[in-house]
Curated annotation (Swiss-Prot):
This is FAD-linked oxidoreductase virI. It holds the Pfam family BBE. It comes from the Eukaryota. Glycans are attached at residues 130, 210, 352, 372, 415. Keywords: FAD, Flavoprotein, Glycoprotein, Oxidoreductase, Signal.
Length: 510
């Protein structure tokens, strides 16, 4: 190589390094290389069988239990190659498995209930650490908190605590785990009263990427505690946690479900905007769920508008708030007073509901401040147009609207957690069950719906709830525009420098 060429290359390298040092390119030490070894159940049994607790199961795809142990709500987020499932029997087993994977360069993924829409999980190849046996719940002597193990889920928790006169914030669907939603913030019917699930964390028992078990709370590893409350999927596996619990206030919840025809759309959304304002849903009105969907008994070509309100208290107080909606003529109107576990059935979010079924969902999602009525009409018209063109998609197509009370969420210091969306009020998403032949149609429909929502809020940047993200959203929209990603990535270099936790909407690209 002649002197001129060497000089040119050296100058180019200096220039390149200068550009890189000022760019947002992720440092090399956070870029994991996918060299995970292929493993077999027999190999893992030989290596780990004697050190794991009695009752731990190790099996692979040929085992009849494999399908249930790896099932996901959205089949589009099914990992590419789960080679081995380790269904741990004790919390201590999690650290042993992670340490084994760390030492042998094997990818690992924690699993509880398999929810979430993101396609980033589909890239995973390696060992699944299944937490489904870790279902212990222990109310503490002071009756102010309880210890929840990592495999608990909403239906189990609600039934256990309600019968003893207590509640804890959980997600809204009975089939969903506690910690999957919580590590992304954790929305639910009680957040108007008590904040997000993660706002109620007292202390977490966490296994880090190298297999180390550690305590994470406001005193011990406080920086990691901040990260776990909003971006926790990127940092560790929660094997158990102490979480605040509360005495239940009322013996029953009041629900009121409406079905409206399309000609009432403008009236309904105008009434919702007056009722909700921007973050003004009353604390006891835990949630209002809405959807556009085809109901064949009413019409096979025009979607109806379905809305369900849930109030933590007596019917009289709830119906006073719902007077504007009672004034809009409905195709049907049903209401009642039920226990909290029965409320999930009334709102069709119970563990046996269709909303919990595993399907090939395609979708999109965003946050809104309020409903742009013109845009909602455009989304409704698009829905009917797509169904007319592809009637086979009708049974599995929905436009969803979720309005949780955010009263308590807004009172909590935003700097206390990495959760970035305390000033967002309405969560919306589109989902359609798509066979392979219509997947491109479903994705185009999802993109068009999202584009209308985004255009309905001129001047606002897109915002995405991490637990509803589909995997193609800008990271800033998920984790925040105000420096959160910079801080989170610095914490990654401290707690997970090899980026082992990179499967669920990762803050550092795979």
């Amino acid at each position: 190589m002649n002197f001129k060429l060497r000089t040119l290359l050296a100058f180019s390298l200096v220039l390149f390094l200068g550009i890189v040092s000022s760019s947002p390119i992720v440092p090399h030490y956070l870029r994991a290389i996918d060299v995970s070894k292929a493993v077999t159940p027999k190999q893992v049994e030989n290596d780990l069988g004697k050190v794991l607790s009695k009752g731990t199961l190790i099996f692979g795809p040929s085992n009849p239990a494999f399908a249930d142990a790896t099932e996901r709500w959205s089949t589009h987020s099914m990992p590419a190659d789960i080679q081995v499932v380790i269904e741990v029997a004790q919390e201590s087993d999690v650290a042993k498995v992670v340490k084994y994977c760390h030492q042998n360069n094997i990818n690992f993924l924690a699993y509880t209930r398999g929810h979430g829409s993101t396609n980033t999980v589909s890239k995973f190849k390696g060992i699944e650490i299944n937490l489904s046996k870790l279902t212990g719940i222990a109310i503490q002597p002071d009756k102010k908190s309880a210890l929840f193990q990592g495999g608990v889920y909403a239906d189990l928790i609600i039934n256990k605590l309600w019968s003893q006169g207590y509640i804890v914030p959980t997600g809204s669907n009975g089939c969903v785990g506690l910690f999957g939603p919580a590590l992304g913030g954790g929305l639910g019917r009680y957040q108007g009263q008590y904040g997000l699930i993660s706002d109620n964390f007292v202390s977490l028992n966490v296994v880090l990427a190298n297999g180390t078990s550690t305590t994470v709370n406001a005193i011990s590893n406080s920086d990691l505690f901040w990260a776990m409350k909003g971006a926790g999927h990127n940092f560790g596996i929660v094997t158990s946690a102490y979480i605040k619990i509360y005495p239940r206030k009322a013996k029953t919840w009041h629900y009121h479900n409406y079905v409206w025809s399309q000609d009432k759309l403008e009236k309904v959304f105008e009434a919702l905007n007056r009722f909700q304002g921007k973050g003004q849903i009353p604390a006891l009105m835990g949630v209002n769920f809405g959807q556009f969907s085809i109901e064949p008994r009413i019409s096979e070509t025009e979607a109806v508008i379905i809305w369900s309100f849930a109030y933590d208290g007596p019917a009289a107080a709830a119906e006073k708030l719902l007077a504007p909606f009672n004034a809009i003529f409905a195709i049907s109107s049903t209401k009642g007073d039920v226990s909290y576990s029965e409320l999930l059935v009334a709102q069709q979010t119970d563990i046996n509901s269709s909303s919990c079924s595993s399907q090939p969902y395609v979708g999109s999602t965003t946050w809104l401040q309020t409903y742009n009525v013109t845009s909602q009409r455009a989304i409704y018209d698009l829905f009917n147009k797509q169904i007319a063109q592809n009637p086979g998609l009708a049974p599995g197509a929905r436009v969803f609207f979720e309005g949780y009370s955010t009263k308590a969420t807004q009172t909590i210091d935003p700097n206390s957690s990495s959760y970035p969306h305390r000033d967002e009020y309405l969560l919306v998403f589109f989902a359609v069950v798509t066979p392979p032949s219509l997947e491109s149609v479903g994705r185009a429909w999802a993109d068009k719906t999202l584009a209308i929502w985004h255009a309905s809020q001129p001047g606002r940047r897109p915002a995405t709830y991490v637990n509803y993200a589909v995997g193609n959203e800008p990271l800033e929209s998920i984790y925040g525009y105000n420096g959160q990603l910079t801080k989170l990535r610095a914490l990654k270099s401290k707690y997970d420098p090899l980026n082992k936790f990179r499967w669920y909407n990762p803050i550092v690209a795979y």
